[in-house]
Amino acid sequence: MIMNSAVSLVILLSLLCEAHTVVLLNPTDSSLPANNFTDTEAALSTPLESADIPKARRKRYISQNDMIAILDYHNQVRGKVFPPAANMEYMVWDENLAKSAEAWAATCIWDHGPSYLLRFLGQNLSVRTGRYRSILQLVKPWYDEVKDYAFPYPQDCNPRCPMRCFGPMCTHYTQMVWATSNRIGCAIHTCQNMNVWGSVWRRAVYLVCNYAPKGNWIGEAPYKVGVPCSSCPPSYGGACTDNLCFPGVTTNYLYWFK
């Protein structure tokens, strides 16, 4: 089956399983946090060849405008959560995460990966056929899951496979607003032919966003409720902007383009 390229569709994956009738088993153990910064950096530095992933040949993995749009949208969403968050950290762009996202997007595999990184990273995926005006058309469906989410735990919108693989999904949203997931890197790749659950999509636009430290730990809330910035980590020095613990201009996304 080959989809008409004029038809615009967005399909999403989460690290737990897919919403509605199409599901995906969780490829990671989300009950054992492995979000140590050093461990994450070590995993990201592992040669991509060892995971049978083609090396990215482009210097940039996403356009500057798309990168800024994705990053700003995440921070807007994070700063406006309800109930308000006391420890929500400002999200910054991470070049290593972007490189790892590009390496995976280049495989055109409609699944999470590579497996050796999923212990350390959160990951949201989106694929689309047809033209689109803004990259946010591939990102906003993740946020739209908020309508099915009730703080603090994604109860009814968190299907558990294989016993209960149906119902709405909200773990894309909770990854977006996981307080300690303060770094993101994304990549876009156009796949000439991409197998999406048995259907071949021509010129599929594949978006991969990687997050660190990863979120969606079972039994944990995405953030602490309270007065915004009242429980920021000491490393932020009390800096706060738009309800987010702010690290300062030297670490924002502009660093990537110096």
From Swiss-Prot:
Residues 71-211 form the SCP domain. Belongs to the CRISP family. It comes from the Eukaryota. It is found in: Secreted. GO terms for cellular component: extracellular region. Residues 1-21 form the signal peptide. N-glycosylated. Keywords: Developmental protein, Glycoprotein, Protease inhibitor, Secreted, Signal. The lineage of its organism: Eukaryota, Metazoa, Chordata, Craniata, Vertebrata. This is Peptidase inhibitor 15. Residues 22-60 form a propeptide. The gene is Pi15. It comes from Mus musculus (Mouse). Serine protease inhibitor which displays weak inhibitory activity against trypsin. May play a role in facial patterning during embryonic development. Weakly expressed. Expressed at low level in prostate, mammary gland, salivary gland and thyroid gland. InterPro entries: Allrgn_V5/Tpx1_CS, CAP_dom, CAP_sf, CRISP-related, PI15_CAP. Glycans are attached at N36, N124. GO terms for molecular function: peptidase inhibitor activity. Disulfide bonds: none annotated.
